[in-house]
Amino acid sequence: MWGRKRPNSSGETRGILSGNRGVDYGSGRGQSGPFEGRWRKLPKMPEAVGTDPSTSRKMAELEEVTLDGKPLQALRVTDLKAALEQRGLAKSGQKSALVKRLKGALMLENLQKHSTPHAAFQPNSQIGEEMSQNSFIKQYLEKQQELLRQRLEREAREAAELEEASAESEDEMTHPEGVASLLPPDFQSSLNRPELELSTHSPRKSSSFSEEKGESDDEKPRKGERRSSRVRQAKSKLPEYSQTAEEEEDQETPSRNLRVRADRNLKIEEEEEEEEEEEDDDDEEEEEVDEAQKSREAEAPTLKQFEDEEGEERTRAKPEKVVDEKPLNIRSQEKGELEKGGRVTRSQEEARRSHLARQQQEKETQIVSLPQEENEVKSSQSLEEKSQSPSPPPLPEDLEKAPVVLQPEQIVSEEETPPPLLTKEASSPPTHIQLQEEMEPVEGPAPPVLIQLSPPNTDAGAREPLASPHPAQLLRSLSPLSGTTDTKAESPAGRVSDESVLPLAQKSSLPECSTQKGVESEREKSAPLPLTVEEFAPAKGITEEPMKKQSLEQKEGRRASHALFPEHSGKQSADSSSSRSSSPSSSSSPSRSPSPDSVASRPQSSPGSKQRDGAQARVHANPHERPKMGSRSTSESRSRSRSRSRSASSSSRKSLSPGVSRDSNTSYTETKDPSCGQEAAAPSGPQLQVLEPKEKAPTFSASVRGRHLSHPEPEQQHVIQRLQPEQGSPKKCEAEEAEPPAATQPQTSETQISHLLESERTHHTVEEKEEVTMDTSENRPENEVPEPPLPVADQVSNDERPEGGAEEEEKKESSMPKSFKRKISVVSATKGVQAGNSDTEGGQPGRKRRWGASTAATQKKPSISITTESLKSLIPDIKPLAGQEAVVDLHADDSRISEDETERNGDDGTHDKGLKICRTVTQVVPAEGQENGQREEEEEKEPEAELPAPPQVSVEVALPPPVEHEVKKVTLGDTLTRRSISQQKSGVSITIDDPVRTAQVPSPPRGKISNIVHISNLVRPFTLGQLKELLGRTGTLVEEAFWIDKIKSHCFVTYSTVEEAVATRTALHGVKWPQSNPKFLCADYAEQDELDYHRGLLVDRPSETKAEEQGAPRPLHPPPPPPVQPPPHPRAEQREQERAVREQWAEREREMERRERTRSEREWDRDKVREGPRSRSRSRDRRRKERAKSKEKKSEKKEKAQEEPPAKLLDDLFRKTKAAPCIYWLPLTESQIVQKEAEQAERAKEREKRRKEREEEEQKEREKEAERERNRQLEREKRREHSRERERDRERERDRGDRERERERDRDRGRERDRRDTKRHSRSRSRSTPVRDRGGRR
């Protein structure tokens, strides 16, 4: 399913985990050296174990362990038991089991002794080369394989019997594996190291061993499946024998146990029944068997077994893995680890088990040293994991690892917290129950893994069949996941934790009828789960992202686990694979919502969610844990399923809050296709990986929520709700983390009952809606908003989320403007107090719809006052009554705007703690006609209302009264109800926040009562349509006499009667509207004169209104009043009045004409259609203002005229220039004249002196220049003379040269002449020589 390499039974290619130990697992030849790739293809391993040097090496390593210098085989059983007792290990079992158990413990002790704080130091790095050459080990391994085959067959039968009883224990075993991961890093590292050492020393051994076993194991699980019915019966008859056989088999092969677990997965349900019977008897045996298995698994056979089991389980897992996908998340992690180091993991598991036994003893004594060891282990593990991670296995494994990465993160947190738990384990190692309990504490500190493990444990009823049957698969899935995890460190941590959990799980479950231990561990884990609830509040912060990822994983896990859960029944009825595939698909949808999904999701869910899930599972399982084993297993399985569903829901919610809408879509799809449950489960691994990133996205997975909600168990739902508030806002989660987890728990417990019931209903409805929403949200373009479904999810999330969560949601909405998911978050302002509490969980605010998308646009929506009570009454069927939900449907653009407004006004609603803001949704005017401002205001109001309006839906938890905002009605009654007033014109629904009154009784009015109301202190955002709707509630407005200033800061409203005006003032005075308004509206009566003045019909402002306005707070920016004029002269006053009257009449006539001209437009304008009325109204306001300004200017001119007389005084005082900007000047006095003249004379003298000096300087300069010129002339003459002289010399030289040349020529000529003469002479001589002589010379 995960795309891992599937080794052939012959082990052709096996990816082996190589730790940082520097051991090369490549060919099993013990090359020591760093492993460059995490995975390596190993050559075909010989099937004969004896021929495998790695196996022999591993065996030799195991064999070399001595006690007091004596080989363990030489010790008597009593000595072995005494040694085991010293180490707090189980003493039951055959000698071989005791030897192996003791060996594991001793190896662990040695590891701890030799382990250094440096992760780089790998104690096993030197062992590799020596071990593979030991022929004895090869023979031993061959024998072991034979024994393993026999015992595997035996175990398959026994396991089939035990599976039924131990189905739960199987899951617990899976959880113990998780517990191992929960174990402190020391344990894990020690476990990992032994396993790694074993694997490093016996890579081949493990591979060949696993190959041989692979065949037998693969066959045996299948045989076990076929024999499951027979084996179940035989197991019920042979519990003790099966335990001993399991011990032997465990000694031989932990992988056998894994296979047995796989077989058990098929037989889990039967085993669960038997498990109940055998749990008590098997506890001790399980402990012993576990220890034996630890030691056995510490041996190479375990590695091979793991590999073989990997192969078998892979073959099985193909059907099962779909079912077990959630377990597969664990298993895939384990398998990833197993496949990479399948052998290593098995050996590691064995070694870990033995080491865990030793560690438990040592940790009892060395609890103090645990932190150091943990640090060392962590460092070594991180190094190992890093080295392993460098060469990730195939992408499928990476996909698996991606979920594992989440788990590693959880594991990291677990490892961080585990030491105390380890201490607990160390203190009570002897009993597996104690160990399990300790594991549970470990789970608590490391809630992520715990929840992965313990929720599986709690869900073991559902998951055990699968998980226990495939411990190897779980290990593999865990190991590949963790191994391949993108964060290598995380994956190592995941591996370590998973592997350590596996050893623990195997200790607790494999050796003994894993059923008993599984059941016990389930009980114990479920018991500690409450602790994890507390713990996971802190863990949330650590693992919020992992939680998100894991929540996705959980979703997938749920699907897978749903499939798995059905698988258990299916396995019982048919072959594991066939039944798994069929039953998961058939029951995947039902069972998914219960335990399996939650189980799988829990492992995948982020640590926080896991913790919550675990806590939930524990909370629910604790009551069940107490009952007898039978009831325990049943109740545990139930509680597990509940906790799973809770954890799934919580994790899904967590993921939802970040933006798991995609995830939820995926999960929803998966839920939709129960038949595809297995397939979906198988793909879920990759999907998880994909989803994990998505989870981070701010979308909410409604379907996930729906699933969680759909889980019928009230407790689960309540827990889910609790978790949901926590998850709702990571901030809240962090805050909760910061808060003591205990605080969350009490609240959770208090609200559990009430919320569980309500939340169940809510969750069911929400689940359906959310699923729809998920699909729609994914499929729709971002512009489209799945309107109703998202609202439901939002309601759920809002209710669940604290206030911060709601705000975050709205922020998310605003951040995701493309998908216009307008969520009118009807989350009460008490959310802030409730953050992290489950108080708000039940509450589900009404859905938000996009603007204009209301189902009945023209219908009047019945007014719903959304109060806690009304929401409670609604919750049973949250389905929105047609149009009754206080839902605002936005057009796409509106929704965008409203989202922006939500961002702007997101926090406005909560400023008044004492107020509850009710919002009235009205449908107004055709969408087309609205002004932009109006639309914005509507939308802004909508978000505003959304933020504060959200009353808690089903939060029955008694919240501190101050937290709940009082709903004050601003209309005549003080109970503000949410009213939907639809104006038939419409298409656009306008949401109006009902005014919020702070003072019960409005103060007495200042002005005389009249039918005109002046409302000031208006603060945007709001639209004229919204304002008029608000004003129209208490009376009929006279449209023509309505005036509002340009910036909408104050308005004059004229009502048809004085009574309506009085009602309006009573309703609106001292009220906050819109909700974001920081000021309180001031409503008072006004006179017609003031209205006329503001409308521009009156030039002078009435004196009363002036006084009134001076006394009353004016709007932010009222139109600037004309400058105060000094009292004009009576004549001017008279003239002014006449002019004002004339202008008034002219203005009124113009107004009448204009009205007639634009009657239709004005009507549109009045209705605020969007076409252009806004600009029209603006231009009208502008015209009015200009008119007012022009009047002001005229009055100013008059004022100037009146002020001129004092200006003439200036003329009297000063003399004035005639130029336009007249300059005033004064003549000088006599003294000044004398002084000035003296100064002038002085200046003249100064100037003269300066002039003379300047002339002298110039003269000197001229003389110097002339001198310089003369010198220059002389220089020039000299140069000329020089050049002439030089020319003459040159001439002379030339003549001399010519003469010389002539002489030379003559000499040459004479020489030539001589040469010619000599030639001629010699020629004549040679001619005269006799021929004889010439011949003789020849």
Swiss-Prot record:
Q: Where in the cell is it found?
A: Nucleus; Nucleus speckle; Nucleus, Nucleoplasm
Bias kind Basic residues: ranges: 1175-1192
Task performed by this protein: Auxiliary component of the splicing-dependent multiprotein exon junction complex (EJC) deposited at splice junction on mRNAs. The EJC is a dynamic structure consisting of core proteins and several peripheral nuclear and cytoplasmic associated factors that join the complex only transiently either during EJC assembly or during subsequent mRNA metabolism.
The family database entries (SMART domains) matched by this protein are listed as: SAP (SM00513)
The name of this protein is Apoptotic chromatin condensation inducer in the nucleus
Main site of residence?
nucleus
| Stored CDD domains | RRM_ACINU
Query: Where does the record place Polar residues bias?
Result: 425-434, 506-518, 744-754, 855-866
Q: Phosphoserine is carried by which residues?
A: 132, 166, 169, 208, 210, 216, 242, 295, 332, 369, 387, 389, 391, 413, 454, 477, 479, 491, 497, 561, 655, 657, 710, 729, 825, 838, 895, 898, 986, 989, 1003, 1179
Covalent cross-link site, Glycyl lysine isopeptide (Lys-Gly) (interchain with G-Cter in SUMO1): K267
Q: Could you give a GO molecular-function term held by this entry?
A: nucleic acid binding
> Acidic residues: which segments have biased composition?
161-171, 269-290, 936-945
Keyword Acetylation on this protein? Answer: yes
User: Where do the record's region annotations for Sufficient for interaction with RNPS1 and SAP18 and formation of the ASAP complex lie?
Assistant: 1209-1236
* Crosslink position(s): Glycyl lysine isopeptide (Lys-Gly) (interchain with G-Cter in SUMO2): K318, K378, K732, K861, K879, K969, K1046, K1106
Relate the assembly described in the record: Found in a mRNA splicing-dependent exon junction complex (EJC). Component of the heterotrimeric ASAP (apoptosis- and splicing-associated protein) complexes consisting of RNPS1, SAP18 and different isoforms of ACIN1; the association of SAP18 seems to require a preformed RNPS1:ACIN1 complex. Interacts with API5. Interacts with SRPK2 in a phosphorylation-dependent manner.
Q: Indicate where the modification N6-acetyllysine is found in the sequence.
A: K861
Q: Which residues carry this modification: N6,N6-dimethyllysine?
A: K654
Point out the annotated site residues (description: Cleavage): Y1093, H1094
Question: What organism is recorded for this protein?
Answer: Mus musculus
Q: Where in this protein does the record say N6,N6,N6-trimethyllysine is found?
A: K654
Q: What post-translational events are described?
A: Undergoes proteolytic cleavage; the processed form is active, contrary to the uncleaved form.
Instruction: Spell out the Basic and acidic residues composition-biased ranges.
Output: 219-228, 313-353, 542-559, 757-767, 798-815, 892-915, 1130-1174, 1193-1214, 1236-1317
